[in-house]
């Protein structure tokens, strides 16, 4: 479009050339066509002029608006400059105030730290003093118990020796008594056996003598009868001549009588033999009874010996039972005394543990609250400081300087917090070591930890591991 405008300006200077021809050389149609093109260009130029006028009006309007906005922004910038100057003044004042507060906080923190250290030192000294006193008391009690135990052992040994001597004397005396009784019983039963044997022999001899006398009497009677019969027979033979038939009859009668007498005598002899056998049977029975009596006497001797041994063992057992009962009573009294001492130690230990736990718990609670308060205050101050920095839009160099100072203050606060945590860990460690020491003492005195009645509290800060270091070292917080 720019060359066409140059062509329009060249019309007034010379004859325009259209399509390589002068207007004079153009035909009517070409001229009309050329005029149509010129009109189209004129319409297009008018449209472009209208468009550029609209653009110019818009640009002018935009320029006016921008100029007014620029003036407004300049006014706002001047206001902001004034506000920044005022904010800078306020910020300087707040920084001075914060510095003063930080100084006060540092002073208060240092004072509280000094007080807590002094307090912890005093408490530790008191606890150590109490611990030493209790340890001395326990050692004295242990020495007294050992001395008493040694005395009781010596007394028991002397008593056992005396009891053994007495027991030996009693056993010897009892043995002599039993031997004497055995000898007396043996002599008594030997005498009884001898008397029984003599009595049985006398009875046997008497019965035999009676039988012999009776048999001798019977034999004498028979001999007398035989003599009488012989005399009668002799008289008969002397008188046979007088009456042979009567004699024969009488002889027959006599022979029959003699046969009867002989049968009677044979029967009597059989009865005497049977009576002898009957007398021999009681003698045999007496002999068997005597052997049975001897066997019974032997079993009686064995039973008597067993009875003697049983009585001796019974007496020994009764003496041992009396001794054991006496020892049981002595041990029971010692047990009651040791139990009372254990109860006293248990009450002392319980009161000491509770007191130490209360002191340590209170001290730990105070330290934790102080640490939490300091951490919360530091976090609050940091948030406020960040808000002030964000609102003040300070120079980067000044911001860096202030940030460095704040970091120094925070670092000092963190170091103070670590010192407090370390001090808290040392106190917890001392408390736990004291608990371990008391538990060891209880085990040394034979008191089970389950009989204490409560579980000692191992102090530790929540979420941290304090006071757990090897070989008495204090663990730092993690």
From Swiss-Prot:
Molecular-function annotations in GO: microtubule binding; small GTPase binding
Residue ranges, annotated region (Disordered): 1-31
First-listed, main subcellular location of the protein, grouped into a coarse class: cytoplasm
Keywords per UniProt: Cell projection, Cilium, Coiled coil, Cytoplasm, Cytoskeleton, Flagellum, Golgi apparatus, Microtubule
Extent of Basic residues compositional bias: 1-12
Keyword Cell wall biogenesis/degradation appears in the UniProt entry: no
Spans annotated as Interaction with SMO: 357-478
InterPro entries to which the protein is assigned, alphabetical: GAS8, GAS8_dom
Region annotation (Microtubule-binding) ranges: 115-258
Family: Belongs to the DRC4 family.
Subunit structure: Component of the nexin-dynein regulatory complex (N-DRC). Interacts with microtubules. Interacts with SMO. Interacts (via coiled-coil domains) with RAB3B (in GTP-bound form). Interacts with DRC1. Interacts with DRC7.
Name recorded for this polypeptide: Dynein regulatory complex subunit 4
Native species: Bos taurus
Organism taxonomic ancestry: Eukaryota, Metazoa, Chordata, Craniata, Vertebrata
Gene name linked to the record: GAS8
